[in-house]
Amino acid sequence: MSVTYATLGELKVGSYIVIDGEPCRIVEMSKAKTGKHGSAKAHVVAVCLFSGNKKTLTAPVDARVEVPIIDKRIGQVIADMGDMVQIMDMETYETFEVEKPKDEDLKSKLQPGVEVEYWVVMGRYMITRVRGAPKS
């Protein structure tokens, strides 16, 4: 199970939400009460974790929304393969390939032997940061 559920009113800026099947981080949120008998609405602007696209959602604050479960793990870069890197998990020792991040500063630090923090979000992998210099 890679998602859990929460009400939209409980979420804040910086929280994570699933919009159109994509995991996103909330960057802007506003709530408005509509009229005498209307329910309060929330307008959410979020950025997709994998593509960087902006997505919006307008719904009642008591609406149930999906929240992605983010598994934060540590791995070691084994090989640089162009626009992909091969990573070995430091706990399970399984190896897998991950697309390089779009951030040029982070991308330049990815070399064999470097420890990285990566996230598993809805069955997809993303590298979030480099933990230290390669061990020689």
UniProtKB/Swiss-Prot annotation:
It is found in: Cytoplasm. GO terms for molecular function: ribosome binding; RNA binding; translation elongation factor activity; translation initiation factor activity. Functions by promoting the formation of the first peptide bond. Keywords: Cytoplasm, Hypusine, Initiation factor, Protein biosynthesis. This is Translation initiation factor 5A. SUPFAM superfamilies: Nucleic acid-binding proteins (SSF50249), Translation proteins SH3-like domain (SSF50104). The keyword Protein biosynthesis applies. Disulfide bonds: none annotated. The modification Hypusine is found at residue 36. GO terms for biological process: positive regulation of translational elongation; positive regulation of translational termination. One of its GO terms (cellular component) is cytoplasm.
